[in-house]
């Protein structure tokens, strides 16, 4: 793929500890949905994924694709429309319902028996299942292994102190010959407390390097006018491909 870079080409910020104690609770994330504070949602889908999607899929059908912290990501329908099975997890029931409504998909809901008080929402077509629960409770549901993970807005949203647990959860869900597509953000963490949090290349190596080959495919300027309120003047997004060693 053109635009391929190694980590050596990518600017990193040295102060990686400044955000380590930042915490957002599940209730605070749910409040963001209730109050419409979801600027992280991309109505047109993620452009880097759109650019590389057919290359990643290689004409295959019937893949199992996992969306951690899925929100109402329109990319879930991209995969479903191509004949793949999509599973997502999201703490906000509102976000899940909005996905099905905005994509004009009928759905059913049922309790998750392994996690009392939670639900799974399933499209009538049967190829989209969205679990409304904590990502850390999900392994209790025995949802199986996945061929691909699309992680955009997930690792960068996880509290820094929970990253190791999160990464171990993701690795436990990966099947043979997996593709783990990971988007992270690069900005000066001394100027913005997050989320989204700054995730440097070294952190990706620490979390996934023992199991995965790690390759940065592309780096793009992601700075928008709204980011000025964060106190920053530049923001880059990096797309990584993690594969089985």
Curated annotation (Swiss-Prot):
Record: residues binding S-adenosyl-L-methionine: 29-40, 69, 90, 134-135, 152
Domain of life assignment: Eukaryota
Keyword set, alphabetical order: Acetylation, Cytoplasm, Methyltransferase, Phosphoprotein, S-adenosyl-L-methionine, Transferase
Localization recorded for this chain is: Cytoplasm
PROSITE patterns linked: SAM_MT_TPMT
Q: Which residues carry this modification: Phosphoserine?
A: 14
Q: Which residues form a coiled coil?
A: none
The record's annotation in InterPro entries points to:
SAM-dependent_MTases_sf, Thiopurine_S-MeTrfase, TPMT
Please describe the quaternary structure of this protein.
Monomer.
The protein's name is Thiopurine S-methyltransferase
Instruction: State the organism of origin.
Output: Pan troglodytes
């Amino acid at each position: 793929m053109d635009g391929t870079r190694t980590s050596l080409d990518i600017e990193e910020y040295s102060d990686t500890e400044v955000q380590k104690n930042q915490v957002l609770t599940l209730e605070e994330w749910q409040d963001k949905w209730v109050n419409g504070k979801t600027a992280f949602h991309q109505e047109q889908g993620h452009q880097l994924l759109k650019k590389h999607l057919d290359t990643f899929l290689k004409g295959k059908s019937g893949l199992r694709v996992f969306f951690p912290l899925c929100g109402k990501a329109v990319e879930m329908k991209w995969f479903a429309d191509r004949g793949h099975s999509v599973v997502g997890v999201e703490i906000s029931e509102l976000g899940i319902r909005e996905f099905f409504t905005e994509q004009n998909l009928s759905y059913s809901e049922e309790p998750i028996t392994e996690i009392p008080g939670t639900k799974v929402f399933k499209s009538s077509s049967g190829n989209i299942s969205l679990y409304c629960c904590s990502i850390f409770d999900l392994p209790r549901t025995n949802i199986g292994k996945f061929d691909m993970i699309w992680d955009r807005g997930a690792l960068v949203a996880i509290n820094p102190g929970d990253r190791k647990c999160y990464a171990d959860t993701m690795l436990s869900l990966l099947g043979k010959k997996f593709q783990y597509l990971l988007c992270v953000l690069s900005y000066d963490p001394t100027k913005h407390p997050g989320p989204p949090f700054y995730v440097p290349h070294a952190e990706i190596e620490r979390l996934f390097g023992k199991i995965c080959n790690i390759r940065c495919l592309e780096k793009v300027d992601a700075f928008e006018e709204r980011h000025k309120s964060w106190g920053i003047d530049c923001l880059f997004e990096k797309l990584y491909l993690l594969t089985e060693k």
